[in-house]
Amino acid sequence: FPAVHYTMGGIWVDYNLMTTIPGLYAIGEANFSDHGANRLGASALMQGLADGYFVLPYTIGDYLSHKIQAPKVKTDTKAFDQAEKEVKEKIAKLLSIGGKQSVDDIHKKLGHIMWENVGMARTKESLEKAITEIQALRKEFWKDVKVVGKENDFNVELEKALRLADFLELGELMARDALNREESCG
């Protein structure tokens, strides 16, 4: 992390990022930490990344493991069968495309679109451009991605391709959400 710049408050949290309300956690810009309460843009972002990646998986999991006494989820339902069928079809489709572009190459293109058009300095025009470019990139992905390996092997490329398919949806949603938000919150 960069050095502390200054703080402007934020929600008080304990070492595990839990507020004074049991089970309610505050991370990133929201909490009262060195980089919380929306300090320098990159610093606040890094606080959220660090909290989400290093701290929360352990603290929330530990908290919930003592609180949740849920019965085992049934898998013999129509909804489960439908979800499983859709995932299997998606996997089969990805493995059958046989395109020329690697998952990483398409992922880099998405990152470039997001960086140039959906970052902190964005305009209506840049957001509209991002939406158009992401839609085109999604078509390109489903037409020309190359996913090597097999379905039932430990297949990192398949895992990355499945995530990238989700990232393409998420990127467009982020751009659309930003486009629809006309007021400033910070």
Residue spans for each PLM region:
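Glycine- and aromatic-enriched mobile tails/lids
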Residues: 6, 12-26, 30-185
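Short loop/turn motifs at secondary-structure junctions and domain boundaries
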Residues: 1-5
